[in-house]
């Protein structure tokens, strides 16, 4: 059965000064899938995510759950759309658990309910042991995992309408936590029928966890397909200028990008 489209962008363009960052992008995202936005530095991945999330305001055509973006009140949309940015400028001496609980601000919950939900997602993202630590004293990776728990908390009460956007969520993480973060994101998509959109640089991580790959180059979509179709030596050479061969993981079966020589 075809999955319903929950987010659609049509003819999306973005320009900063004289630089055309995005050029007439048409893209749609469905419930229950993980979509990786990929491409070299400056391809437009994060800019596209910011447009789609509403972080960059635009008069262009974006729809959430079949309803025009401009028709949504921000408070209502925040119950259904959560964005994990590349970095946070939070500098106040909050405790780690208080940062996660900030995700519940859009929700009408008691303090006890907020605590229970926050603890659930802190366990999933492996930050329970940091609960009473001061946020500014944490490492970059620990902060990244805390904010992931915060965004999951934000979406806990959103019913069957969930869009989770992650902008380079593994950039500060060690190997084990990279995989745990993407495993949690995929589980969130499948178990809660959520749409998950994630900006990544690692093609092999994307191949393992994403259902679809949207590869951008110079502000345009080069390919929008499953990993098996998106990852070819020709596409990788054209987009990244890198000579690669495509293998296959011996047990999990997903495509593996390897040096051609």
Swiss-Prot record:
Keywords: ATP-binding, Cell inner membrane, Cell membrane, Membrane, Nucleotide-binding, Translocase, Transport. Gene3D superfamilies: P-loop containing nucleotide triphosphate hydrolases. It is found in: Cell inner membrane. Its main location: membrane. CDD domains: ABC_Iron-Siderophores_B12_Hemin. Residues 7-243 form the ABC transporter domain. It holds the Pfam family ABC_tran. The keyword ATP-binding applies. InterPro entries: AAA+_ATPase (IPR003593), ABC_transporter-like_ATP-bd (IPR003439), P-loop_NTPase (IPR027417). GO terms for molecular function: ATP binding; ATP hydrolysis activity. GO terms for cellular component: plasma membrane. ATP binds at residues 39-46. It is a peripheral membrane protein. NCBIfam families: PRK13548.1 (NF010068). The complex is composed of two ATP-binding proteins (HmuV), two transmembrane proteins (HmuU) and a solute-binding protein (HmuT). This is Hemin import ATP-binding protein HmuV.
């Amino acid at each position: 059965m075809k999955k319903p489209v929950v987010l659609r962008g049509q003819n999306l363009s973005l320009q900063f000064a004289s630089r055309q960052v995005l050029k007439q992008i048409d893209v749609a995202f469905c419930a229950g899938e993980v979509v990786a936005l990929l491409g070299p530095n400056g391809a437009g991945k994060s800019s596209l995510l910011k447009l789609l999330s509403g972080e960059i305001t635009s008069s262009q055509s974006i729809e959430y759950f079949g309803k025009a973006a401009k028709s949504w009140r921000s408070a209502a949309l925040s119950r259904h759309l959560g964005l994990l940015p590349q970095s946070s400028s939070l500098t106040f001496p909050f405790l780690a658990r208080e940062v996660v609980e900030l995700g519940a601000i859009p929700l009408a919950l008691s303090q006890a309910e907020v605590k229970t939900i926050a603890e659930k997602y802190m366990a999933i993202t492996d930050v329970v042991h940091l609960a009473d630590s001061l946020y500014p004293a944490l490492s970059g990776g620990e902060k990244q995992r805390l904010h992931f728990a915060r965004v999951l908390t934000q979406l806990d009460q959103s019913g069957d309408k969930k869009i989770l956007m992650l902008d380079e969520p593994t950039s500060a993480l060690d190997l084990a936590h990279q995989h745990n973060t993407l495993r949690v994101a995929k589980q969130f998509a499948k178990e809660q029928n959520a749409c998950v959109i994630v900006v990544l640089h690692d093609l092999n991580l994307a191949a393992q966890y994403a259902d679809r790959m949207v590869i951008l180059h110079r502000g345009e979509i080069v390919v929008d397909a499953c990993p098996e179709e998106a990852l070819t030596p020709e596409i990788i050479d054209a987009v990244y200028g890198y000579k690669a061969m495509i293998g296959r993981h011996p047990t999990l079966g997903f495509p593996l990008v390897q040096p051609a020589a």
